Amino acid sequence: AGLGAPYWAPEARGTVTGLTRGSGKGEIARATLDAMALQNVDILMAMEADIGKPMTALKVDGGASANNLLMQLQSDYLNRPITRPEVIETTVAGACFLAGLGEGVWASADEIARVWRSDRVFEVQLTDAERAERMLSWQLAVDRTLYTPS
């Protein structure tokens, strides 16, 4: 398993906490989405600490961005709006745009930037208290994975 950025702990073990006898596939799937979103919070916080200022706008792309619940969780936990583009496979689109720029299809990078379109903006729905509770639960879960008895 291991735990990547910003912890860099290859010895960490995977865990799912908070399960009850009534937990099923739905709860496991939701825990996975929560963990994905919360790991991104840790990474973004580390990035903001490195650059010394908050990032106010966040745009997402890639296959995972098609999941509305994941994007809403991301917005809620990061406490900022998340913007998803109409074309989520931006790596491929970017390669095509750069090739077009090189061949003269596009006059400038500014012209390419004007092609970008937003599909949806996910606005924060969690209260500060709810967010603080979930962040504390996440940090406790991370701490459990990092603990290695002697």
Residue ranges and their predicted role:
Residues A1-S150:
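Glycine/Thr-rich phosphate-binding loops that ligate phosphate moieties of nucleotide
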